[in-house]
Amino acid sequence: MQRYAVGIEFSGIQYRGWQTQQPGVASVQETIERVLSKIADEPITLHGAGRTDAGVHATNMVAHFDTNAIRPERGWIMGANSQLPKDISIQWIKQMDEEFHARFKATARRYRYVVYNAPHRPALLHKQVTHIYQKLDVQKMIKAASKFEGTHNFETFRAAACQSNQPVRHVKHCRLFEHGRYLVLDIQADGFLHHMVRNIMGCLLEIGQGMYEIDHIDTMFAAEDRKAAGITAPPDGLYFIQCYYPEQFDLPQPPLGPHWLNLPE
């Protein structure tokens, strides 16, 4: 039995998220499993580093699978990409020891959320960025983002349906930066709760619109109640961009994504 790690890029527009759903509901995981199973001539189960919501994208989702099939790495990539839909692509594949696990060996995960702040909507980036037409106080949002760094109970900032046993997470960095009309939130943590990034972004957008002051974030944390926070930002602008592992696994590190997502801070 061979174990392979894979790096996957996908647009989430047509899918109900990463995780396999009930029959007839499109998911990224099930779509890839179906293709890999055909190539391997045996059932394949993918184990992903994380789960993404419906409409959320990824530039380097890491997953792994086990198989008895023997194929060169290039053969897996070319075979899969020739059969996958155009909005899913295998970027790399690497044979691993059994010790590797895409989810449980991950030490951190990283997302970027992209906002296009302009009076008109961007037709070419439809459902790839979140369009906000209102004028935003960007400097205030930048200061507010740092409030989420460190170890906190994120009960207020997770979905009511979140299934995680405990809401405490350590956020290594939470930074907002501006490039012209683009606002990019870059956040890295040891793990994320359901809707956590989208709820944080929703909070920052409301602060940028003057709905409340930065210190109100402390009140939200203290409440430990989802109702204490504001909107959940749309999925359109959210990207899973990186997953971190111990150096011993030596996984490829591709670029973060297209130029408007790969903007330097």
Swiss-Prot record:
It comes from Acinetobacter baumannii (strain SDF). The active site is at D53 (nucleophile). The lineage of its organism: Bacteria, Pseudomonadati, Pseudomonadota, Gammaproteobacteria, Moraxellales. InterPro entries: PsdUridine_synth_cat_dom_sf (IPR020103), PsdUridine_synth_TruA (IPR001406), PsdUridine_synth_TruA_a/b_dom (IPR020097), PsdUridine_synth_TruA_C (IPR020095), TruA/RsuA/RluB/E/F_N (IPR020094). The keyword Ribonucleoprotein does not apply. Belongs to the tRNA pseudouridine synthase TruA family. NCBIfam families: hisT_truA (TIGR00071). GO terms for biological process: tRNA pseudouridine synthesis. Transmembrane segments: none annotated. Homodimer. Its EC number is 5.4.99.12. This is tRNA pseudouridine synthase A.
